[in-house]
Amino acid sequence: MERYPSYKPSGVKWLGEIPSHWEVKRLASYFTERRVKVSDKEYEPLSVTKLGVFPQWENVAKTNDGDNRKLVKKGDFVINSRSDRKGSSGVSDRDGSVSLINIVLQPRNTIRADFSNYLLKSYKFIEEYYRNGRGIVADLWTTRYDEMKMIKLAVPPLEEQSAIATYLDTATAKIDAAIAQQQKMIDLLNERKQIIINRAVTKGLNPNAKMKDSGVEWIGEVPEHWEVRKLKHMFSRIADGTHFSPQTTDEGYPYITATDVDGKGINYQNTKKISSKDYETLVMSGCKAYKGEILLVKDGATTGRVGLKTDDVDCVALSSVAMLRPKKDSSELFLMYLLKSFVIQEQIFESMAGAAMPRITLVKLKNFFALLPPENEQKDIANYIEKMIFPIEEAIKITSSQISLLQERKQIIINEVVTGKVRVG
């Protein structure tokens, strides 16, 4: 790709130099805000995600504000105004309705919808958009239309917008196809990993062990000397975190939510913080997560995700996270893999059937049944699983890294093209 023949200063930090014939105007010159309130009974409810704007899933959690939504028309650009939904935006391909937290932009006749989808979803614009927001709490802020409309954009003539959108459609489609291929590989690796876990925690390691009927059709036979117990008899504590959200702070104690349980343990990278006072209150309420406990997500899209707390970090949990403390005669690692296995995951799935929002209660969780071998056998099984899945997890890390590089490459191409740093066509 080549550069344009001549450039000029845009006068805008996030844009830098732009092609000489491009115009710099405020966003309000290219869009008007659509503020028509409608009901989701009249207009299909839409979800605004990082991947774009889509029809709302039937089982998504609904609010009581179905009659208090914003109208969206085909070709409108919609963006979530809150920083914790950063990047959730896109052009809608249909009429519908969105929640009031979103800003709906109707393009004027000086900007194309397909071009605006790339421009306003570019990394540089998104950063500029949220930079103009105002704080709700320490780590959460929102950007209103009054602030958004003042952001300056650099826009080429309509014909050039069309060429840019066409070029990016082709370029990003190739990258997306490569990402999909890598994701397929990860799915296959995860499937292989799950097979290893499932077999080990239901059949054991001795192929010559005497077997008995488990009494459950989808589990089949299990080693004769294994016990079938309910989870409440395998853990000395099964509790969840706080049912109210404390004020977050810039410094303080980690406050674990469902997004912080990463499938192996706790990822503290983006963990919210709370004050010492709130921390002490929640510890007294039984919301502290201790080293050696297994964390299980019990609410939301990642319900069923499991991680073992192996660190000494003092932290408390939200109600979306259950904390399970293994009894002293049990292997923490084995029980973590048991909770990851289809024995428990199938029961989680069944308990959520027909629910508007993915969720399991502590009462149901405590009464899930599971298979329990003797402690020494638990340790052998856990060590075997660790050994067998290690190369699989390494392959997943490498493939995930390749996906990240492809996503980064995609964003670089979009940013370079929509800000005029390179010329297409």
Task: Name what the model sees in each region.
Residues 3-4, 18-60, 66-68, 85, ...:
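Low-complexity, Lys/Gly-biased intrinsically disordered segments
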Residues 6-10, 82, 96-103, 136-162, ...:
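A short glycine-rich beta-alpha junction/loop motif
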Residues 7-38, 150, 158, 162, ...:
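Non-catalytic DNA-recognition/assembly elements of restriction-modification systems
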Residues 61-67, 138, 150, 283-284, ...:
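A structural connector/turn signal
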